[in-house]
């Protein structure tokens, strides 16, 4: 149906609106501050060009990431309890997973807290967990991915590979935003299923978008 095929387009424009509102809302006071000789911290660094979720969070809401790193990640990962956990993991799990188990757990906790920071309800907690699970998994599987790239002779310096990684990251971010839009957790899967079943990408170019409330100027 038309309403069903609108789901991903509305979601796409929500992502664009979110970035423009958030980045623009920060860039305006930064620009005004520079008129008075005050250099405020950069908060966004072209996140649309990120090639991984980790890279995305280095570029998106940079001041929040820096605060979480200094006041959550380091205190947790360098605590005595996590030191013991790290030694236990090295002994009982072994391998790469054992070496980075404690660090990965601390990373997961950070993104869980980022979810709560955005809003103390299931939508934002699920959003934080989505990012935490994927980033933690990427840490644990990093060496496996490197072996696959070597076996497939992937040139990770090529423009094609960078485009692929950028689009893949954008897709993961796009899916994650469904959690913050759905009224209930079950609705997330309903929206995703609708997106897959009724994509109709041609509507991005055939003028249908104007019917969503956009006006030509």
Predicted regions and their residues:
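Membrane-embedded transmembrane alpha-helical bundles that form the catalytic cores
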Residues: 2-216
């Amino acid at each position: 149906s038309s309403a069903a095929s609108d789901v991903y387009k509305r979601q796409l424009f929500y992502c664009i609106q979110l970035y423009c509102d958030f980045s623009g809302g920060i860039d305006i006071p930064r620009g005004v501050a520079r008129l008075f000789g005050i250099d405020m911290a950069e908060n966004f660094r072209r996140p649309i060009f990120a090639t991984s979720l980790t890279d995305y969070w280095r570029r998106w809401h940079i001041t929040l990431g820096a605060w979480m790193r200094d006041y959550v990640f380091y205190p947790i990962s360098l605590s005595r309890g996590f030191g013991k956990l790290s030694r236990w993991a090295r002994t009982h799990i072994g391998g790469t997973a054992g070496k980075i188990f404690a660090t990965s757990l601390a990373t997961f906790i950070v993104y869980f807290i980022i979810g709560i920071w955005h809003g103390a309800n299931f939508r934002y907690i699920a959003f934080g967990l989505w990012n935490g699970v994927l980033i933690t998994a990427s840490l644990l599987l990093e060496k496996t991915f490197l072996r696959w790239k070597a076996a497939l002779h992937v040139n990770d310096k090529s423009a094609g590979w960078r485009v692929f990684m950028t689009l893949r990251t954008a897709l993961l971010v796009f899916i994650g935003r469904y959690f913050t839009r759905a009224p209930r957790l079950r609705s997330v899967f309903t929206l995703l299923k609708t997106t897959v079943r009724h994509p109709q990408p041609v509507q991005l170019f055939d003028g249908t978008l104007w019917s969503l409330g956009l006006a030509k100027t």
